[in-house]
Curated annotation (Swiss-Prot):
Organismal lineage: Bacteria, Pseudomonadati, Pseudomonadota, Gammaproteobacteria, Enterobacterales
GO molecular function, a single term: lipopolysaccharide N-acetylmannosaminouronosyltransferase activity
GO biological process: enterobacterial common antigen biosynthetic process
Family: Belongs to the glycosyltransferase 26 family.
Statement: the UniProt record of this protein carries the keyword Transcription: no
Classification via InterPro entries: UDP-ManNAcA_Trfase_WecG, WecG_TagA_CpsF
EC annotation from Swiss-Prot or TrEMBL: 2.4.1.180
Gene that specifies this protein: wecG
Record organism: Salmonella arizonae (strain ATCC BAA-731 / CDC346-86 / RSK2980)
Protein name, per record: UDP-N-acetyl-D-mannosaminuronic acid transferase
Keywords: Glycosyltransferase, Transferase
Catalytic activity: UDP-N-acetyl-alpha-D-mannosaminouronate + N-acetyl-alpha-D-glucosaminyl-di-trans,octa-cis-undecaprenyl diphosphate = beta-D-ManNAcA-(1->4)-alpha-D-GlcNAc-di-trans,octa-cis-undecaprenyl diphosphate + UDP + H(+)
Pathway linked to the protein: Bacterial outer membrane biogenesis; enterobacterial common antigen biosynthesis
Length: 246
């Protein structure tokens, strides 16, 4: 592996997180020496760390994922505070997914999409093919029962997908990825939350200036005041951050 593709690990609350410097570094890491890595990508933000702290099952799923990375700006700031020499930047999951799809389209990597509403999923497929000529070898919307899971996993295995992205929200997507890997282990899995909705324009993402200032969370709160209860949970994370309890 070249130095460009190597990345240090930084531990927060006992979970090792990959320290990517920027998006090119992330892509070089995932495609080290021209070979796409296999395993599970999980985006880590403050809310997910809190959930992992309170729910042992969720923590076990996250801990089992090979590639945990700093998606939230608060997590990046905590890494920098705990490890002053760390050269780590936020790599937003939505941006990483788009970059991964663009690379997959360029290289002809087979992709399987899971999650979203049927119409959103169809629009996602159409846009991926039109924009980057992505080789989509199968898809499944998010409306399937646990009893239907094994048949889905068999489809994914038969498709030969090398990238499987799952948009079902946490922890559902982590459960699906974990279970699917038992049937189809030789692929890169990525949990992407509401990314398909953003990609197809059904949900508006914060403007770039808000993202660059690390205020995407505030934009979402102002756009969706109902999120206030979720945001209040983050006070506990702030205590961890400012008391060096990470």
């Amino acid at each position: 592996m070249t130095n460009n593709a190597a990345a240090p690990l930084y531990s927060l609350r006992g979970l090792p997180l990959i320290g990517w410097r920027d998006m090119p570094h992330a892509l070089n890491y995932l495609f080290a020496d021209g070979q796409l890595k296999q395993g599970t990508l999980v985006a880590i933000n403050a809310e997910k760390l809190l959930t992992a702290e309170d729910n042992p099952d969720v923590r076990a799923l996250i801990a089992a994922a090979e590639f945990k990375y700093a998606d939230g700006i608060s997590v990046v700031r905590s890494i920098r505070k705990k490890f002053p020499q760390a050269q780590v930047s936020r790599v937003a999951g939505a941006d990483l997914w788009e970059a991964l799809m663009a690379r997959a389209g360029k290289e002809g990597t087979p992709v399987f999409l899971i999650g979203g509403k049927p119409e959103v999923l169809a629009q996602t497929e159409e846009k991926l093919r039109a924009q980057w000529n992505v080789n989509i070898v199968g898809s499944q919307d998010g409306y399937f029962t646990p009893e239907q899971s094994q048949a889905l996993f068999a489809r994914i295995h038969a498709s030969g997908a090398q990238i499987v992205t799952v948009a079902m929200g946490s922890p559902k997507q982590e459960i699906v990825m974990h279970d699917c890997r038992e049937v189809h282990p030789h692929a890169l899995y990525m949990g992407v939350g509401g990314t398909y909705d953003v990609f197809t324009g059904h949900v508006k993402r914060a403007p770039k200036i808000w993202q660059n200032l690390g205020l995407e969370w505030l934009y979402r709160l102002l756009s969706q005041p109902s999120r206030i209860t979720r945001q209040m949970r983050l006070l506990r994370y702030l205590r961890w951050h400012y008391t060096d309890d990470l």
